[in-house]
Amino acid sequence: ARAEGRSPLVMAARNCHRTFVFAAAMLDFDVCWLCPPAKGSYLACKITPALLDSALGAAEKKPDAVYITSPDYLGNVADIAGLAEVCHRHGVLLAVDNAHGAYLRFLPVSRHPIDLGADICCDSAHKTLPVLTGGAYLHISNNAPALFAAEARRALALFGSTSPSYLILESLDAANRELAGDFPARLADMAERTSALRQRLSAYGFAVIGDEP
């Protein structure tokens, strides 16, 4: 977009973290908001592939990327595979804020955004993995444009500290060793327990919000 002499345009779900808004202000890219219908709820609802397809088809200016938060702050997990298919059919990249979903890669069947077709996503490892606060992973799909890797390194150099916390780095390495061990088996067991608890709560008449594993 910059090479064409225009500001990049990102279509973003309105329930994004405020840091996305700060990034738009700092990097001077334009944003068009994607707001799902409330469907009688006061809570945020998921962006569906049908809604995204309609929004992209009706857009006066095609965005360069779509930005989705999944899981969201209420535990809703979007249909990333469906959203990725829609984005790529329209010639648009898909970026996912997977801050609360670092563990999704280690379920019996991976639900991680990269495995489901996203072009780029970030995991806040410290939120759902045994990592010190501030530890995170940036994932770039092998199917993403070739310049992504180089641009990511440049951006990290621009915004990252030259004095990183080696405590955080070591905690990421320790977590990687944990993930390579029996973590997937323990996660599968916990997911089964969580599902059973949801069913029991629903049976007692509680409205259980979110479909996160």
Task: Locate the predicted segments by residue.
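Conserved PLP-binding active-site segment of the aspartate aminotransferase-like
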Residues: 213
